[in-house]
Amino acid sequence: MAKQDPKDKNSDSPNLSIPINNNNNENLDNDQELLNNNNNNNNNNNNNNNNNNNNNNNNNNNNNLISSSRKHKDEESNYDSDDEKSVYQIAKEHEGEDDGDDEYFPIPLDELMPNHENDELTKKIKQTRPEDKTGLYVYCRNATYTVKHRENKKVKIKLIDDISFYLKPKEMTLILGTPGCGKSTIFQMLAGQLKDKHFKGELLFNGHPINHKNHHRDISYVTQDDIHVPTLTVKETFRFALDCLGRKELTNEEKKETVDNCMNLLGLKESENTVVGDNFVRGISGGQKKRVTIGVGVIKGSNLLLMDEPTSGLDSSTSFEILSDVKKFVTYGYSPALITLLQPSVQLTSLFDNLMILNKGRICYFGPMNKALGYFKKLGFACPSHNNPAEFFQEVVDAPERYSFIHPPKCKTSKDFVRAYRESEFYKDLMEKMDANKDGIVDDNKPKVLVDSTAKELGMYPHGIGYQTKICMKRGFTMIRRNYYNFLTRVAKGIFFGLLLGTLYWRIGHNQSGGMERFGLLFFIMVTIIFSSFAAVNSFFGERKVFYSQKALYYYKTGAYFISSIICDIPAGILEVAFFGPIVYWLANLRPVFIRFVYFMLLLIMTDNLSLSFAKMCAAISPTIEIANVIASVILSIWLLFSGFTAPKNDIGGWWIWLYYISPYTWIFQGLSINEFTYQEYGCKTSELIPPRTPQNLLPYPEGFGGNQVCQFTSGEQIMDAFGITNPNYFKWVVFGILSAYIVFFYVVCFFALKYFNFEDKKSKLAVKKLKKKKKVKTTKQDEESAAISSEALERIDDDNDDDADYETEIKKKKSHKKQKEDTVIDVKSPSSLTTGSPYYNINNNNNNLSGSGNNIKKRKVKTPSNLSPSVNSPITINSPMPTSPSNNNNNNNSNEKSKNGKDIGSETGSYLQFKKLCYAVDVKVDDPDNPKKKKSQRLQLLTDIDGYVKPGQMLALMGPSGAGKSTLLDVLAQRKTGGHITGEILINGKPPSEFTNRIRAYVEQMDVLPPTQTVREAIAFSARCRLPPEVTKEERESYVDKIVEVLSLSSIKDLKIGVLGDGLSVSQRKRVNIGVELASNPEILFLDEPTSGLDSGDAFKVIDVVNKIAKVMNRTVICTVHQPSAAIFEFFDQLLLLKQGGETIYFGPLGNQSSVILDYCDKLGMHIKPHINPADFVMTLADQGKMVEGPNGEQVPLDAKKAYFESDICKKEYEIMEGQLIPDDFVIKTYDSRFASSWMTQFRALCMRSWLSRLRRPAIFVSNCIRSILLAVLLGTLFVRMDYEQKDARSRVSLLFFSFLFAGMVAIGNIPTTVLERGVFYREVTAGFYHSTAYMTSYVLTSYPFTLSTGILYIIPTFWIAGLDSGRHSSKFWYCLFIFIITYVMYDAFGLCLAVCLPNEVMASTICGIGLSLSTLFGGFVIARPNYPSAYYWCHYLDWLRYPLEASCTNEFTGLTFVCTNNKGAVPIPIIENGVQIAIKYYCPITNGDDFMLTYGFHKFMRYIDIAAIFGYIFIFVGLSFWGFKKIRWFNR
């Protein structure tokens, strides 16, 4: 049974209306010719009744009437006019008329802030305000700031262009404008952050030029980024800001009071002891972080307040609370304020005294807020009564046709608006005031005495470097105390490695093997300390962003922060050494002399500081953490290689000996060795005497040695000499001086890098790598000093709204396109009859039925928008027979018709979604009242008995205050929850969801997780390839993708890489791409989680306009959570589900035309909306706790919103619909028999192509790995160049192979960051049903092999031949060695992949990887030969994956080799003694047979092929764990 749609309108309903827009933002090629109303404005008044009647008739004819409050996005208008009056002539004609001031805007301050003059905050401000405070008078005249284009230095870009304005105390000025308009540049100019050489014009503060030395002390600059120390509490964050920026005279009690007042003001008192938090540390909410950002900006007090988007991410009530308090600060604290906002409500806008509208660096209006509407009305632009004036101000310059009641509009481009403003009375008045007050004080009541910062000669900082260092140290130790787990980790690691090394080298003897093992132990002790401090690279990057932010705001000098950072880092190193050093020292039986033990401990502490300083230097000089790790790892490897252990000094060629001397680890190793070996005697066990007692050696001299044996090394000095260490004992103290010089050098470089570099700024720039062929990128403005083409530039390319393009030329270009059939006639009302002041058009598909057209109205052809009409040439369209209509005006009569052109993917209908008694709860830990020390589990109810439905073609808005459960409900409906307790019923087309439901639904998440290396079109095409069924041909699929790109207005950027946030597409573009990716699956139901969050009104409108097209044009079911929607956006929705705190329904039903249904409902409850109030904001007040409404007798009574709704007629009607037959009898329900639309092989091919391109488009990673391989190959090859068959060459061959495998381990660490980044994309896509997880994993692994293998090949081939390794017969040894290296690189790549997949984050994966590589080095068989391992550690040796490639390559190399001692070089002299008399000296050559030499390491020739099997075994284990991790592990919960 069909039910009456609550949105059906009667004959008394207002006309369905839409403002027409010639918006170049939508490149839809839809040249339309509108009626010229120059002669018909008066006639339209007489036709209103006819229009109303026709409007009603059309509603009853299944939406034959195209009526959309936002149809201007789909149509572009073309105006023909002979009237070429200039803008100022039009203004002159209106001079005698009413000024157009609106009695409802701005809202009076007394109404917004009752009793604001006498509340507690105002009193406190007045009491604490210094008596002599006057604030800053800002005088800016003809200011222009020009920079050179980053790529083309000859091109100069004006970021601001000849702007003039003034600011004075006690007034707030609002800046509005689209991204790239110049807002940030003005803020930087007033904050003194721009370079004078690029600035032209006059800028005065209190009549004086800017003094860069101390100007910042007069201002408070609140940035839009919430950058704070995550481990500090809210109170500590405020106190630190006040300590740094506050006046020196403030006492401790005054500071406490100031901090408390600030927290109370911002509503943060209850959270004062909660840490701020970040992505890894749980803390306060995002809205609270924004309040903290505002608080630290204003806490010092200032004479000028600059705030850049301070309410971004906050709900409307919180935003108003904060800015109303700012208003009090400004009014009663005598500080002027300049503030920019994204989507301000009418209440927020009314708080401001003045308005500045910017567009592309030029002022389009500057004047009183209460005169702004009248100014634009005189120009022919009117703000509809139901619209927020702030939206009107933001959009009128970019979309003048939308608001013009004079056609064609005389201001068509921003240049026209600038010209109109320059010709207006406002500009003339401004110039007169500035001419009359050239002293820079534009005020009728000038103060007698003004603050002069230049005269006071204030310092740059309020406090000296000593005090700054003190408070930075205090903060640093607080951070350390909060990060106690880092201390515990280092302590645990120290104890673990101390016990490991101590027991592994348990009680080493002072014999020959003990002497060699001590060298290995000392080397590994050094390496352990070095790698422990190396984690500072990652941690320092986390701190660096906060430092850059606070340095820019002049919290402290770089030196103060730097000194405190060094001091605060010392305890952690000392603590680790305090546990690690004694354990390993005494267990391993190192020299039991107290002074040597003290030296050992001091040198380890010095080593820790050296490594820490080196790691910080690498982090400070590197733009990204990846580059820092590459630089640090390469240098570290080279320094360790030349430290004297792997390659002793005597074995290093003269061309590389300089690396031995500049390596700081050389001197650490020498210091440890000298301390351990000097003045120590060594002996031999019987088995260590040389030559061994073999029959050959027992023969009498000269055939043998006559049984004579010697102990090769009898003193520590002899052992050191074998390693090239010849310095005396006192030199170990010189080592401290050498290391101190290194530490100072590293810290000095780090200090200057921090002082003069700011890599975070450079990250925000984006160089456009590729545009569509033949697409010319025009020079754009940006609010960045470097003027690189940034995401703002991409916005302008995307918008294609070039100010310099001639308006009429564009119209002519559009006319030249192929004409399409005449299908629409437009009836234009007279502007005088419009209560809203905006042009309204009735668009009727029946050309023969023109309501009230009259004889003066011309019929014109209107081209059908390309995105609304079926394509003649394409077999697939995304179009529907129903036109785009405003949701609130739509009758929602859906059609399942198919395109006549064939398979019409986009015309398939949506699904009916219904939910009944839906509840959701989670288990949380709370304090146990019976035992305060324990926690108990308690169930927290987040959603309670939620009912509702959505039909195809409808848009349902989920709204409510923060914490009401909007996103929770969306996740439950989309079945994205991974935990919690869900009860109730969800029905899709009358049936419960199944495992195949992913085929018909799509979820656009709030965080736009997209593959960064794909282009826009590739991302959408990939989704289509994986998620469309095989019945769709390639041509059809490609056509479908092209249509999506067109509808989403992504054509101009479709060939650009997506990138990452801040270094790629803008937020708005990423949002539309995300929608396109989900739309490519041809879903029947589309879920969107806050798609407008973080966008300005223009971008938010674009996104929701696209969603509206999806719902109406494609007849889809759309459910969307929205946060602070504008009136224009709110109009798009058909239904509203409003939740209150606790997740309970307080309204579910239709919105109606211009929100008439819900506003009527509110009116019946005693809530009456005033003009210019956003209906969305007004409706949200239903959810206010303790809401008071007007009772029957005019009295104020409390409102129970939930009870009122369930007793209302709307509720009864909605439940009748839900309980009745919601789904029509003729509705066709699709059925599926597979979870995935495409086959495994199709998914695999698509994934292989994407993964391959992704790796190719990250050339920096691959090229850096290749360069590193080549450099290390040349370095190691020439270090061991053309090895011969002498004694030292035998050891050198083993060292070369061992170190080569260590370098292979770098592949594992280097791939972790990329894999973790890709993992987020995988989680989103596999949850959405893109593909099988096995298809992804297989493609990811296989496509990595060419890059991994090429890295290994580029290393081993040059190394092998330069070093002169044995190639064997027919180069068989070379090919075997190459094969071993290839599979070893694959094994390490699989190891890194396994850790990146199975561990929660990059930091932990890198840490575990480093520990794993360290342990593999220790047990691999080189540092300690297998025969020398304690029996308890044999299992570690056999489990070590490094053992097998090392054994395989070494046995391959040494098989069949014979070594000699030419000229007794390397031989051991054996005195021949007979009858107690030495008769001769005979030399013994220790290493003669390669196979025997391998046995000393425990390596066996017969194991070579078993080793290959073991390597493959590890590859399968790591890859298998990776498959399991991808399939089973999800490091996030919903």
Curated annotation (Swiss-Prot):
Membrane topology field: Multi-pass membrane protein
Spans annotated as Disordered: 1-85, 781-907
Domain named ABC transmembrane type-2: residues: 481-757, 1256-1529
Domain of life: Eukaryota
GO molecular function, one term: ATP binding
Annotated TM spans: 486-506, 521-541, 566-586, 592-612, 625-645, 652-672, 734-754, 1261-1281, 1296-1316, 1345-1365, 1377-1397, 1404-1424, 1506-1526
Record field: compositional bias (Acidic residues): 797-808
A GO BP entry: sorocarp morphogenesis
Comp. bias regions, Low complexity: 21-65, 842-856, 874-896
Biased composition (Basic and acidic residues): 1-11, 897-906
Residues that hold ATP 1 according to the record: 177-184
Domain ABC transporter: 138-385, 924-1166
Protein's recorded name: ABC transporter G family member 6
Taxonomic placement: Eukaryota, Amoebozoa, Evosea, Eumycetozoa, Dictyostelia
Gene this protein is translated from: abcG6
